[in-house]
From Swiss-Prot:
Cd(2+) 2 binds at C19, C24, C39, C42. Coiled coil: none annotated. Cd(2+) 4 binds at C46, C58, C64, C72. Induction: By cadmium. The keyword DNA repair does not apply. Disulfide bonds: none annotated. Keywords: Cadmium, Metal-binding, Metal-thiolate cluster. The keyword DNA repair does not apply. This is Metallothionein 10-III. Cd(2+) 5 binds at C48, C52, C54, C58. It comes from Mytilus edulis (Blue mussel). One of its GO terms (molecular function) is metal ion binding.
């Protein structure tokens, strides 16, 4: 039985607080929509309003930088 926080073995992307970075292996396919991703390897998704793209260096909501005139969500 795979470890509950091992995303590679369980095929489930764990983004909640139930997992710490310990023993958690998530790949690029694991995308979380909040700053609370506890798995190492999870990609926190940065979203800008409308069709605006996020600028380079955006690693999540706290570092989200959108094009001028766009808001981050």
């Amino acid at each position: 039985m795979p470890a509950p926080c091992n995303c590679i073995e369980s095929n489930v992307c764990i983004c909640g607080t139930g997992c710490s970075g310990e023993g958690c292996r998530c790949g690029d396919a694991c995308k979380c929509s909040g700053a609370d991703c506890k798995c190492s390897g999870c990609k926190v998704v940065c979203k800008c309003s409308g069709s605006c793209a996020c600028e380079a260096g955006c690693t999540g909501p706290s570092t989200c930088r959108c094009a001028p005139g766009c808001s981050c969500k």
